[in-house]
């Protein structure tokens, strides 16, 4: 079996590529980083360090690589013969790889019609569907019909902390022990592709929301509260009992929303929350607070990690979630001048107040009870950024 994976960065090597290799695929990485591509070609293997209570080294073998800029024809050839195509390139790059994926499908349709599955492993909702639309734009009507019959575009949700890192060996990558790869099965063509460690589900929606309202919510809260106390990493922030209790309160609130909406076991979801808290406190990882906190305007969105669970909590339970409100207030205090969104957010607050910022970016009218709660928490965080 052969898998073509776009993106030989830390997530590509440390998460997706390692699972595919363990599943028996010959993995061909496709990237533009000439050093990484060259080393993968020369060595055919790399090291993954799993940073748990005890560090474990895993060797990923039987891999190769191609440069998508200088070896485009070879990339087309391997797609034409592949069993699986995956990506971990970042959402903005999906349109850039679509032309070569489309060319690979065109070559494939000319020589064979065996099923191919495409899975975009990106930190976005419906990432594979987005890639599919970009690819279809480069195909004729007849080729689009062939794609609908022989290519399964499978949406997925991925979760593994792979922190920013610098290693002596450019191919080595450190990851946390926990991972989740949930793949929606509805568009499978023929048989489900064998992927060790992944699980196929009928409806991906609840899994995406569980991660967004737990992992992303908690991560953001720890970062914004940690920033106010001048911590450098999420791990440092989570060792502050006050911050940890704030995060636990917010995740209890977002968890109540999930349990109510999806009919889940409260006990099982609280175990998931406990696991998530443990991941944030992993002393073997160093998760930079400025990296986690960046792009606050996006994270203040009405469908994102803080406002969405808070608004739904208000609607479901008729009261304000004070833990989530404190997280939103801390986000509004994030003023790192190196972050363009943080600078724009602070300018909006200076001109229109936090009510104006919440209206513009979170879609919250001033009369919404959450706004008053956020204002109260915000005012308690003075200009010296004390909690």
UniProtKB/Swiss-Prot annotation:
Top-level EC class as recorded in UniProt: oxidoreductase
Catalytic reaction annotation: D-mannitol 1-phosphate + NAD(+) = beta-D-fructose 6-phosphate + NADH + H(+)
Entry keyword Oxidoreductase: yes
EC number: 1.1.1.17
Alphabetical keyword list: NAD, Oxidoreductase
Any Pfam family: Mannitol_dh
Entry-linked Gene3D superfamilies: N-(1-d-carboxylethyl)-l-norvaline Dehydrogenase, domain 2, NAD(P)-binding Rossmann-like Domain
SUPFAM superfamilies: 6-phosphogluconate dehydrogenase C-terminal domain-like (SSF48179), NAD(P)-binding Rossmann-fold domains (SSF51735)
Sites where the protein binds NAD(+): 3-14
GO cellular component, one term: cytosol
Keyword DNA damage on entry: no
InterPro entries registered for this protein in UniProt: 6-PGluconate_DH-like_C_sf (IPR008927), 6PGD_dom2 (IPR013328), Mannitol_1_phos_5_DH (IPR023028), Mannitol_DH (IPR000669), Mannitol_DH_C (IPR013118), Mannitol_DH_CS (IPR023027), Mannitol_DH_N (IPR013131), NAD(P)-bd_dom_sf (IPR036291)
Molecular function, one GO term: mannitol-1-phosphate 5-dehydrogenase activity
Entry's Gene Ontology BP terms: mannitol catabolic process
Family recorded in the similarity comment: Belongs to the mannitol dehydrogenase family.
Protein name, per record: Mannitol-1-phosphate 5-dehydrogenase
Organism field: Geobacillus kaustophilus (strain HTA426)
Designated gene of the protein: mtlD
């Amino acid at each position: 079996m052969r898998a073509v994976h776009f993106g030989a960065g830390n997530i590509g090597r440390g998460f997706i590529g390692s699972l595919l290799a363990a599943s028996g695929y010959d993995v061909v990485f496709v990237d533009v980083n000439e050093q990484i591509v060259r080393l993968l070609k020369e060595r055919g293997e790399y090291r993954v360090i799993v940073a748990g209570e005890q560090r474990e080294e895993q060797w990923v073998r039987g891999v190769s690589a191609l440069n998508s800029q200088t070896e485009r024809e070879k990339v087309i050839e391997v797609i034409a013969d592949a069993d699986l195509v995956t990506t971990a390139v970042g959402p903005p790059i999906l349109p850039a790889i679509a032309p070569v994926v489309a060319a690979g499908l065109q070559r494939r349709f000319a020589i064979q019609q065996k099923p191919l599955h495409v899975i975009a492993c990106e930190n976005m909702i419906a990432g594979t569907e987005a890639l599919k639309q970009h690819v279809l734009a480069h195909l004729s009507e007849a080729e689009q019909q062939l794609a609908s019959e022989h290519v399964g575009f499978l949406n997925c949700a991925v979760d593994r902390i792979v922190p920013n890192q610098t290693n002596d060996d450019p191919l080595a990558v450190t990851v946390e022990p926990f991972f989740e790869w949930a793949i929606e099965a509805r568009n499978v063509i023929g048989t489900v592709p064998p992927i060790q460690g992944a699980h196929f589900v009928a409806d991906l929606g609840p899994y995406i929301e569980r991660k967004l309202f737990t992992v992303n919510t908690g991560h953001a809260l720890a970062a914004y509260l940690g920033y106010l106390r001048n911590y450098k990493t999420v791990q440092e922030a989570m060792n502050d009992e006050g911050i940890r209790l704030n995060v636990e309160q917010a995740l209890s609130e977002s968890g109540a929303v999930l349990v109510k909406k999806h009919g889940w076991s409260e006990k099982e979801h609280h175990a998931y929350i406990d696991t998530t808290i443990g991941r944030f406190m992993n002393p073997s990882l160093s998760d930079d607070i400025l990296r986690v906190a960046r792009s606050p305007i996006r994270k203040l969105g009405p469908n994102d990690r803080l406002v969405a669970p808070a608004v739904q909590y208000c609607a479901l339970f008729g009261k304000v979630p004070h833990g989530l409100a404190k997280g939103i207030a801390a986000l509004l205090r994030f003023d790192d001048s190196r972050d363009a969104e943080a600078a724009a957010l602070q300018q909006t607050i200076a001109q229109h107040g936090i009510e104006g910022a919440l209206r513009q970016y979170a879609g919250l009218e001033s009369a919404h009870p959450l706004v008053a709660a956020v204002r109260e928490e915000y005012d308690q965080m003075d200009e010296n950024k004390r909690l």
